[in-house]
Design a protein with these regions (language model features):
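PLP-dependent enzyme catalytic core of the Aspartate aminotransferase-like
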Residues: 2, 92, 96, 100-102, ...
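N-terminal small-domain helix-loop-helix segment of the aminotransferase-like
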Residues: 4-115, 166, 321-324, 328, ...
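Generic structural signal for small/hydrophobic residues in well-ordered secondary structure
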Residues: 30, 48, 65, 90, ...
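Conserved core of the PLP fold type I
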Residues: 73-212, 217, 223-246, 251
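Conserved core segment of the aminotransferase class I/II
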Residues: 244-336
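Short beta-strand-to-loop capping motifs
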Residues: 272, 374-378, 412-414
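Conserved glycine-rich beta-strand-loop-beta hairpin in the small C-terminal domain of fold type I
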Residues: 311-314, 318, 331-346, 356-375
Length: 436
């Protein structure tokens, strides 16, 4: 059976890297196999494993950061709470595109949402000794679980695939009722499945978070990228869906990486509700000199981690957020290309007997966006991921994202125009070699 890349090349590299179960191969392991296979074979790979922005950084941010550096900002430490212009811009941005009010004091810059998540985990897990476990609504970003492993915090997970709509509440309550859950974590839109939790589902999450005094960490890394709706007009509905309408127990993690393609500078904001920011918890007060939740997050956790966020990058994010909410910069228009790529890729895969694993948001077809998921009849995740390597296509298995479904995560960010024909040609051979 002929394949575009000889099996011996791929299998040899997999063995060389010590990967015994390809279903559990990490993103960087898959990337390494793909890069080395491409070099050894001379055959171009269609790389779909890395979730890296495939667009230029927003120029308005670059210009503002360069100006800040030229003005001499690099010599001084940034305020641990963040520069006022960014805090104000973040507050206005949240109002403009989410439709909720958070005071500037609760909008705190972080060194990428990764740091925001780490500091949030630290703060949430220490607020109450009885609440020592984080709950993930999976699938999700695997590195967040690694963060908890690094800090020694327990976590539980469930795959939301079979628990959408009215099934979500009872499933959540089965965990929350035990009294040990300090935080609920999910991304919306979701990495890797691209499902978008609906308002009625977010309402259930919010109401249960209030009932069981649990904090919701809403990861908005792919902000406003539900391309089924026009979320691009500031201060006008429809808005980005959020749990913030249904509880005061929330933290919003907003990243500059995907919406503004500003990943390299590691900049984001964590927005803490006004009520939670000022709330006192006995265990936090005892440990941190009587400080309430918000100042513990910033003046203890963030201070200990990095003593602030890059001064010049804060000016970049402030400029991008301000240009967006003033209607001068349509960030949604810039990232729309990811949706177009997903639509074309899905058509090719589905034409050759693949199927979309997470294919619905309740009664509505899933949006096209930065990620989507694929499966192939009769193949496990590991089998499919390895088999596609022989065809010069690389992607990661859903099991690494906490999913219980057999399939792969496909990222659209690195797809180039000439690769659609290439993929069509290779998937035609794949289908012939793997008849169903």
């Amino acid at each position: 059976m002929e394949t575009p890349i000889k099996k011996e090349i791929v299998d040899g590299l997999v063995a060389e890297l010590g990967i015994t179960d390809f279903a559990k191969a990490t993103i960087r392991e898959v990337k390494q196999v793909a890069a080395k296979s491409e070099k050894a074979s001379g055959v171009e790979f269609i790389k779909m494993e890395m979730g890296i922005p495939g667009l230029p950084a927003a120029q308005v941010g670059v210009d503002a950061q360069v100006k800040a550096l030229q003005d001499g900002i690099a010599h001084s430490y940034p305020d641990i709470q963040g520069i006022p212009v960014l805090k104000e811009a973040a507050s206005q941005f949240v109002k403009a595109f989410i439709g909720i009010d958070i005071k500037p004091e609760g909008c705190i810059p972080v060194t990428g949402s990764m740091q925001g998540t780490f500091a949030s985990f630290l703060t949430c897990s220490q607020r109450d000794k009885q609440k020592d476990t984080v709950l993930f609504i999976d699938p999700g970003f695997p590195v967040q679980k690694m963060q908890l492993e690094v800090m020694g915090v327990k976590y539980q997970t469930f795959d939301v695939y079979d628990f959408r709509g009215e099934k979500l509440g009872p499933k959540l309550e089965s965990y929350l009722s035990k009294g040990n859950i300090c935080a609920i974590v999910y991304s919306n839109p979701n990495n890797p499945s691209w499902i978008c939790l609906r308002e009625e589902e977010l309402q259930v999450i919010g109401e249960l978070a209030t009932k069981y005094d649990t904090i919701v960490m809403e990861d908005l890394a792919y902000f406003a990228m539900d391309f089924r709706k026009d979320l691009s007009t500031p201060f006008k509905a429809p808005y980005q869906a959020t749990v913030a309408r249904y509880t005061d127990n929330y933290m919003l993690l907003i990243s500059g990486s995907k919406a503004f393609s500003y990943a390299g500078e590691r900049i984001g904001v964590t927005c803490i509700s006004d009520a939670l920011f000022h709330r006192h918890f006995d265990d936090l007060s005892e440990r941190y000199q009587g400080l309430p939740f918000g100042p513990v997050f910033s003046t203890r956790m963030l201070y200990a981690l990095s003593s602030g966020t890059s001064h010049s990058a804060q000016y970049a994010l402030a400029a991008m957020l301000k240009a967006a909410y003033e209607g001068k910069y349509d960030f949604r228009k810039e990232v729309n290309v990811y949706g177009e790529r997903a639509r074309k890729l899905k058509e090719i895969f589905c034409r050759h007997k693949f199927y979309v694993v997470y294919d619905k948001d309740l009664d509505e077809p899933i949006a096209d966006g930065f990620y989507f998921t694929i499966g192939y009849p009769g193949m496990t995740s590991g089998q499919l991921a390895l088999e596609l390597m022989y065809y010069g296509v690389s992607a990661i298995c859903l099991i690494t994202c906490g999913s219980e479904q057999e399939g792969l995560r496909v990222c659209t960010s690195f797809i180039e125009d000439h690769q659609y024909d290439l993929l069509e040609e290779r998937m035609k051979i794949f289908e012939t070699n793997n008849p169903r």
